[in-house]
Amino acid sequence: MSVLRSTCLFFPPRSLLISFNKRRLFSTSRLILNKESETTKKKDKSKQQDFNPRHLGVAAEIFIPSAYKNLPNVFAHPLIVANALIRRLYTFGLNSVQVALFRFQSGIKPSFLLWKNKAIETYINVNTSFAHKNLSDIKGLVSLWVQEALEARSRQLPGNATLDWQLIKFNAVPKLVSVQPIMIPGMPLEHLQLVYKFDTKQRLIKVNQQTKKTETLDRDVVDYIAFLCDATTNDMILMGSLFESKPNDKLPKSYEDDAKVAIHRMKVNGDIYRLPPS
């Protein structure tokens, strides 16, 4: 009897076993979930570290409203002018909505004045460095698509001449014409695509090293330059350039679902010194 009693002491009640198994199962599940959570965080962190914003270019068509001076005569083409004005108002409203959505979803207050000043600074640095053939100085300021195009054009510059580029003045206040939030997979909403209109008077000075002859060319230039803006760091990367839409152009779709078309468009828009389409 004493042996049986002592033996029974080694067997806990059934309810205690069930309780113990539940606790063990719960702790094991929690450990697995914690490990999975840590693995997911590490993967997300590695994705963020692998992301390079310089890989992004202008992939989608962007509607740039025609300047008032480029609209046809309202009496000769009233419908075209009316549609152009409607699209201009629609674009203005869409930009306002995009800004509001970005601010709501990201919780970041846009710093438009700072971004405009940094865009101007980047624009000047890129043009100056290209004229001086110092593309290494602006490597972090431009996308890979722009860098590739600048390197190709730099090889076409005359070897026996030195160039200097100067921004004489702005003919009009730089204007933000397009705002589009950029969603990057695996990352919070932090980036914007901003397109600025720069109406400038520029000077290009060319000096022939053999004859020492100097040529000076002054001209008015209107550029529509796209930038990738990191709203958390205020860093600006020049993504490419665009051209003003024609008065009878329709609104394009806001995204490009064909990868080949998107890549081709990023390459074309990366050449900021290309001529406008005829």
Curated annotation (Swiss-Prot):
Keywords: Membrane, Mitochondrion, Mitochondrion inner membrane, Transit peptide. One of its GO terms (cellular component) is mitochondrion. GO terms for biological process: inner mitochondrial membrane organization; positive regulation of mitochondrial translation; protein insertion into mitochondrial inner membrane from matrix. The keyword Transit peptide applies. It is found in: Mitochondrion inner membrane. It is a peripheral membrane protein. Its main location: mitochondrion. The keyword Transit peptide applies. Disruption phenotype: Leads to a reduced growth rate on non-fermentable carbon sources, which is more pronounced at high temperature. Shows defects in the membrane insertion of nascent chains resulting in the accumulation of the precursor form of subunit 2 of cytochrome oxidase. InterPro entries: Mba1, Mba1_Saccharomycetales. Residues 1-33 form a transit peptide. GO terms for molecular function: mitochondrial ribosome binding; ribosome binding. Present with 2720 molecules/cell in log phase SD medium. Mitochondrial inner membrane-associated mitoribosome receptor that spatially aligns the mitoribosome exit tunnel with the membrane insertion machinery and allows cotranslational protein membrane insertion. Interacts with OXA1 and MDM38. Binds to mitoribosomes in order to recruit them to the mitochondrial inner membrane. This is Inner membrane mitoribosome receptor MBA1, mitochondrial. It comes from Saccharomyces cerevisiae (strain ATCC 204508 / S288c) (Baker's yeast). The gene is MBA1.
